[in-house]
Amino acid sequence: YPGFDAAFVQQMKTLCAGADYLLPNITEACFLTDTEFKTEYDRAYIDELIAKLTALGAKTVVLTGVSYQQGKTGVVVYENGTYQYYEHEQIAGGVHGTGDIYASCFVGAKMRGKTAYEAAVIAADFVLECIKESQKDPTHTYGARFEPALCKLMQML
């Protein structure tokens, strides 16, 4: 994972202790919790990851890239002892920048008064729209095309 050496991970763990919201994907969560990364997993594995993340000090965990069934992907939101899961279609092929877009959208939705779960859903749906927009243009080779989807984001908010 580029940019994630042991020193970086240790510093991130320190930051997690004061975090109100932690939004890692599964790979990042494994680094932060010293957990073996698995390509196939069940709910118990995800629950264990989230428990380890909250043990670092984060109050609310939004774990992205969680897939309990083929063709679907989603997020698990853990807040105040409650788990909520949201999923949508999984689109083949990766697009750079979706994690940054997700985090930015999540924060924007929270600033607009949405709950953590509502913000997680809005961010997931917006990222999905960005990926779809990116795939419409075969000449676009780097980064998610978020600009064409901004109108949809404003409707979601």
Language-model features, listed with the residues they occupy:
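Glycine-rich beta-alpha junction loops
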Residues: 28, 65-68, 90-92, 123-128
